[in-house]
Amino acid sequence: MTTYYFALASQNFLLVQEPLEEVFRERVNYYQSNNKAIDFWLIPNPSFLEKPEMISFKNLVPKDAVAIISTNPIFINWLKLRIGYICIGQFEDNLQLSEESLNITVLTDKI
């Protein structure tokens, strides 16, 4: 089992009000320059909120929740400090999230 850490908020807050694109762009550039694999994902309407042990988190956010999931607890804690009004937590699962399993291609060319 893998421990996943998450930051959770409404889609409006994270995707419209906060500069999340800038945060992700900086983080991806940092990972690429240090030859690190991406270990965070943006998940709209995360299904892990349906687990019984997640009911307290589910009740804190509207139905249009979005989660940032990572295997790196330091990144999630940093997001909490940077963004502020988000919930953070963790769960264990057999998910094997990776760029390959999610069919993600990271573009390296500047547009």
Swiss-Prot record:
Plastid in keyword set: yes
Leader sequence range is none
Upper lineage? Eukaryota, Rhodophyta, Bangiophyceae, Bangiales, Bangiaceae
Q: Which organism is it from?
A: Pyropia yezoensis
The UniProt similarity line reads:
Belongs to the ycf54 family.
Stored InterPro entries: Ycf54 (IPR019616), Ycf54-like_sf (IPR038409)
Predominantly, its location class is plastid
Residue ranges of coiled coil: none
Task: Give a single Pfam family match.
Answer: Ycf54
Can the keyword Chloroplast be found in this entry's annotation?
yes
Instruction: Kindly list the places in or outside the cell where this protein is found, as annotated in its UniProt entry.
Output: Plastid, Chloroplast
One cellular component term (GO) for this entry is: chloroplast
Give UniProt keywords alphabetically.
Chloroplast, Plastid
What is the protein's name according to its record?
Answer: Uncharacterized protein ycf54
